[in-house]
Amino acid sequence: MTVDELWQARAAAWELAALSLRYPGSELAEAAAGGEWDEAAGEILAALGLPAEVPAAAGDPAGPPAARAADTAGPAGADALLRALRPEATRLFVGAPEPACSPYEGVWAAEADGVQPLLFVNPRSMEVERFMRSCGLGRPEGTNEPLDHVATECELLERLALRAAGAPASEGAPDGAGLPGGSPAAAYGRFLSGHAQAWMPAFAERLAAEARHPFYRAAAAYLEALLAD
């Protein structure tokens, strides 16, 4: 594998992680129901040399693979899976009154420091926002989602990996020398070690423990394996 191919594999890895940890949509449900998610996760981890046991994303994890595929394949299976994933994602990541597994780095940092977490205005969230803006990634217009959401952090790593593989900068993003550390690879390494690896392993562990649907146990195992790269 060439250096560019390695970065392309990393970009694909974080793209799948971001898709998996956003609020579920039809793209995710179709991929998980049809088996494409399982195939992609296995191929990506193998390409990166990260052996891991990732459970099946859909169906009865104890049942035979053929039966799981038959139960979930096709539009009806994807629709049923989406109806199951959305309330589970809400319970896990939004909660009432508290999420079972907060998806925000700032909340995890505050918890580690023993202080009350505040979205947006806590020091870690503000640090993440500054880093992302320095890479050309800001909050989408008309939204108020904090940028330290796990899926957004995965998206940043995907973008930096693509830049390291030779992709051009998106509109409004600095050139390579203008990124933190002076290059896409350096910015990727800084964010991975300084942010993602600082809190996502604990997030993945709690997600695996709290998840009631097989998909989120699979997503947790995949993320945990990816963080070892």
What positions do the PLM features span?
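Surface/interface-facing alpha-helical segments and adjacent flexible terminal/loop regions used
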Residues: 1-229
